[in-house]
Structures are given as structure tokens and as C-alpha cells.
Amino acid sequence: MSIITDVYAREILDSRGNPTIEVEVYTESGAFGRGMVPSGASTGEYEAVELRDGDKARYGGKGVTKAVDNVNNIIAEAIIGYDVRDQMAIDKAMIALDGTPNKGKLGANAILGVSIAVARAAADYLEVPLYHYLGGFNTKVLPTPMMNIINGGSHADNSIDFQEFMIMPVGAPTFKEALRMGAEVFHALAAILKSRGLATSVGDEGGFAPNLGSNEEGFEVIIEAIEKAGYVPGKDVVLAMDAASSEFYDKEKGVYVLADSGEGEKTTDEMIKFYEELVSKYPIISIEDGLDENDWDGFKKLTDVLGDKVQLVGDDLFVTNTQKLSEGIEKGIANSILIKVNQIGTLTETFEAIEMAKEAGYTAVVSHRSGETEDSTISDIAVATNAGQIKTGSLSRTDRIAKYNQLLRIEDQLGEVAEYKGLKSFYNLKAA
């Protein structure tokens, strides 16, 4: 009864109006699962391959009909007949079917769509919530959210080099209260920007994209918004950032070019000094991709300098890849990994990366992409793995809010068992 009988993929649109893939899996019993695949704007050099058509006459070359065909004509034939509950075997079968190290033949987007749909169909068959199916019945930790309320870099057309300026409501007692705090700060920020004649239009992830005088001004205006909302910076709400430094690193010169803000060129050592100054001045608890993904020597220096007091998250650095993460752990580089399901391409590999991180004392931050859908699977993954942190955008745009609303439902379902750890989510820091 739990045998897969049909697999069907179609081309849909993501939150940026670009094509992506949606997959449906059906079983003998009538159980059903659907998975939608996100897409990134700033992508790591070593990410699994997102298969696009390249036909400029259609969606500017961004169509995914090849990936859709790969699901409907190749993957479907291979996995029909499998028990939908055998997630690992199905994921491994798709990896073998692709046969490349980066899923470049079938496409990570094709494979991931199936992987998510299979998990959802299995949960439907067993009549349990997805987070319980994926994580068992010890799932209880609601993640502390990183809320991206000012967008810059590749996510916005403005004068800010850093890609994301985020708040984390660590002082909240529950996820529900954390969400309220975040929303109140978001609206306070809107009022401040409007009063200064600055834009309150939003970027890809729902945050504001104002033209500020410097990168540092992003932190200053957020501190002001936290206080305006009635909270204490550093106690109730802390700051986090995603520099996405690979996006402004000049490989030929070997320097970081802060061109959007006009702050000029900086060496690796100067960037590290810059982060030290920011951390001493503002309640910043997390820095993501502070240096270029290939600047491992620089990352080692950064970790030695700030690793005890600041969460140093590897996104482009690790690309949710256990080989990359294992190398980083061995060399003492960073102390956290960003988890993006489409960087690696299956749920099995995603869970392996989270487990490896935790065993090494690294935190795992489950993350969305800038091109999202209404699919809220990452909310269930965050709870299923007791990851403790999630990054899923600002307090606007339904594609972001869908994840937060799912977490509200999960917290309600868990009832008294639910835990919101706030500052204790940073078990990788001595100060926390």
C-alpha cells in the first residue's frame, strides 16, 4: 500500500517569477506528496547543479523543462515500485542514477523535488506531521529565526555591499513571541526609513532595500528600530549578518571591493579587522560568509580571532556538503554551517550534513533561498533535526511568511513539549 505508483513533475514559478520545478509522488494507498524547489541568487561555486534549459527564447534561458523531463521519463521509471518510506534508498538510487559528483546530469533541482515529495508522501501515508516523520518523536525545538530586514548585495539594487542585515529575537520565551517581536521591529524600521525619505520597497527576501550611506549604517538604523519597538538591543534582540563576500571579492587582485557603499578595497586582514570593529560596536552574534569561499586561510584567521564569541557561518564555504564541512572541521574553520537543501540535492544528504555539524560542535542554520515558493518543508526540517536556528527571510512576502506560519502551527501541535531556546541555540559560543 505504501508503494510508489506514479511520479509527476511540472514547471512552476518561484517568488522572483523564474521557473522552478514541482514534483508530485503518489502511492497505492492514495497517499500523496508534493515538493517545490527553491533557487538562489548568490550561489556557491561548489553547489550541486541546478539544471536550466538555456533556451534564450523561453524564460530568458531559465526554463526547467529538461529537469521536468528527467523526472517524468528517467527518475519516475527508476523509483516507481519503491516503498515511499524508504527515503534513504530512494535518494541513493537517484544519486546513482545521476552518476556525477554535482548532480549535473539529472539536475539537483529534479532530484530534490522528488526527494521532498517522497518524504511528504510517506508522512501522508503514516498520517503523521512531516517533522515527526523526518525526526521521530524527539522533535521539540522551535528554531530561533534570523530575520533579514535589510537587503543589500545581490538581493537588492542599492548602495549596500553586505547581502543581509538580520535580527534574532533571542529574548523571546516562545517562537510565537519571537515572531511578534520581529514583526514589531520590522514595522518600526519601516517607519524610521519612511521618516527619512528612504525607500521602503523590499528585496528578494522581503527586507527593505534603502540607499544608506554605509554598510555600518544598516546596523545603526536597525538598533534604532529595535529600541523604537520597545526592546533592548543585545538582550531581547541581537544582530546577524550575511556578508556574502564571494560576491564582492576580486579574484585577480585578491581583495574585497566594497563598491556599492563606496568604502573601497580591503585585504583579508582588513576585512577581519573591520568585523572585529563591528562586533565590538554592535550586538552582532552571527556573521555568514565573512570572507570568500576559497579564502580558507583567511577564514582560519577569522575563526581564531572571533570564533569564541561570534557564530561564523559557512554558506558558500561549505555548500551543505559533508566533504567540504569535514575539511572545515578538521582545519578549525568557521563554527557553523548554513543548510540549504538545494545546494546538495537530497534530504538524506541534508540530514547527514546537519548530523556531522552537530557532532563537531558546529551549529546548523536551516535556510531558504532568495527564489522561494510556498513550500514550507524547511520549517519541518528545522524542527525535525532540533537545529535550533532558521533563516527564512523578512516579515513580508508570502513565500517567507509561509515558513513562519508553519512553525507557528508546529509549536501549537507540540504544545507543552515545544522548546524555544533563543540565545541557547548558540551552543558553539563560549559567551552564550
Swiss-Prot record:
Active site per database record: 205, 340
UniProt-annotated location(s): Cytoplasm; Secreted; Cell surface
InterPro entries with a match to the protein in the record: Enolase (IPR000941), Enolase-like_C_sf (IPR036849), Enolase-like_N (IPR029017), Enolase_C (IPR020810), Enolase_CS (IPR020809), Enolase_N (IPR020811)
UniProt entry tagged with the keyword DNA-binding: no
**Broadest EC class assigned to this enzyme:** lyase
Reactions that this protein is recorded to catalyse: (2R)-2-phosphoglycerate = phosphoenolpyruvate + H2O
The UniProt note on the cofactor reads as follows: Binds a second Mg(2+) ion via substrate during catalysis.
Please give the activity regulation comment for this entry. The covalent binding to the substrate causes inactivation of the enzyme, and possibly serves as a signal for the export of the protein.
Q: Name one GO molecular function term.
A: phosphopyruvate hydratase activity
Single GO cellular component term = cell surface
Keyword Cell division in record: no
Which residues span the membrane?
A: none
Q: Where does (2R)-2-phosphoglycerate bind?
A: 163, 340, 369-370, 391
Enzyme Commission number(s) of this protein: 4.2.1.11
Which UniProt keywords are present, listed alphabetically? Cytoplasm, Glycolysis, Lyase, Magnesium, Metal-binding, Secreted
This protein's assembly is summarised as: Homodimer.
Q: Which PANTHER family match?
A: ENOLASE
Q: What does this protein do?
A: Catalyzes the reversible conversion of 2-phosphoglycerate (2-PG) into phosphoenolpyruvate (PEP). It is essential for the degradation of carbohydrates via glycolysis.
Q: What is the protein name for this chain?
A: Enolase
What is the organism of origin for this protein? Enterococcus hirae
Give the organism's phylogenetic lineage: Bacteria, Bacillati, Bacillota, Bacilli, Lactobacillales
